[in-house]
Amino acid sequence: MTDRNEFLNDINKIVIKIGTSSLTKQNCDSTKENCSIDPTFIENIAAQVSELRKLGKEVIVVSSGAIGVGLYELGIAPKPREIPIRQAAAAVGQSILMQYWSEAFSKHGIKVAQILLTYEFYSDRVSYLNLRNSISTLLEYGVVPIINENDCTCTNEIEAIFGDNDKLSAMVASKIDADLLIILSDIDGLFDKNPKIHEDARLISLVEKITPEIESYGGDPTSFKGVGGMRTKIKAAKICSMAGCYVLIANSEIEDVLLKVLSGKEIGTLFLAERHIQKNRARWIILSRASGTIRVDAGAKAAVLGKNSLLSAGVVDVEGNFDRGDVVRLECEGRVFAKGITDYTSEELMKIKGAHTDEIEGILGYNNYSNVIKKENIGIMEN
């Protein structure tokens, strides 16, 4: 058994992600699907956060639950398919959610601040950079930021983007250089097989590196109230790993779970971080929404992983429509291994794919860039 204190002794900045199922578990109707906020749970979390702050820890909370609470309050049947209804529910539920958080923390003399984000926010470089400053300022003033996705105004299908805020919490943790992301849900951690089906399923206490085998353990979502299954939590761990941030997945039903985790108790699954931390710009590129895909050959992949630029000779195919300056995925043999900011449009790349640099001008009539993607504009997603 691994000594958790070996990894968690120097933890100072913590992001706590709380899933919908945890927030509403004890306050459901007879169907077990239509649920409202469990105030006792929120009060317990606030009390634990207060204790962590007394120990000098900085804490940010990422809270799901707005849509579910809104549906309950409006008397709407669970899981409506219509986006406008879900957005309306989110608007109602978010205000109620914040009221509970504010009241719970006020009992400990702590103020809270609401921050609502969308994925598009991360694709804008200026907004992305400003997030760090905003959160840092709130922490300096002793405020606990409460973050959620802006479900009411997001232009994409709700919950298809962040995965019940698993990805959102990881992106926040990555951006603010958090030391630890704690994901609380209704599951005990990562198992080598589905524990609801297999009695011999084994809880994996420590993940040193996220391998394809580890990813295969993700399976399908396990919680019927949230949308964030284990697969999205593993993806969240991958995002945090490249930023040097640990991830701990634990069951929210454990009494004083946050305090026990930080005291080194063997709870849930701990994902370690990469030793090589991606630079801030590379992290932004990786976290940005891709406008398309550039498929490359094995030689080009090796060159990119070796911290070299992508040349047109290594381009095999192009998918999607994108312009110069857009973020695109780099794919080889069906696997995305990097993202980058392209210097050529998809239309141009279709014409020059496979061509050597000195042939570009003859094909296009001009040669504005010798590289398809400069090395400083690439974020590596696998080593």
UniProtKB/Swiss-Prot annotation:
One of its GO terms (molecular function) is RNA binding. Pathway: Amino-acid biosynthesis; L-proline biosynthesis; L-glutamate 5-semialdehyde from L-glutamate: step 1/2. GO terms for cellular component: cytosol. It comes from the Archaea. Its EC number is 2.7.2.11. Substrate binds at residues 64, 151, 165. It is an enzyme of class 2 (transferase). Residues 291-367 form the PUA domain. It catalyses: L-glutamate + ATP = L-glutamyl 5-phosphate + ADP. Its main location: cytoplasm. ATP binds at residues 17, 185-186. One of its GO terms (biological process) is L-proline biosynthetic process. It holds the Pfam family AA_kinase. InterPro entries: AceGlu_kinase-like_sf, Asp/Glu/Uridylate_kinase, G5K_ProB, Glu/AcGlu_kinase, Glu_5kinase, Glu_5kinase/COase_Synthase, Glutamate_5-kinase_CS, PUA. It is found in: Cytoplasm. SMART domains: PUA. Keywords: Amino-acid biosynthesis, ATP-binding, Cytoplasm, Kinase, Nucleotide-binding, Proline biosynthesis, Transferase. Belongs to the glutamate 5-kinase family. Catalyzes the transfer of a phosphate group to glutamate to form L-glutamate 5-phosphate. This is Glutamate 5-kinase. It comes from Methanosarcina barkeri (strain Fusaro / DSM 804). The lineage of its organism: Archaea, Methanobacteriati, Methanobacteriota, Stenosarchaea group, Methanomicrobia.
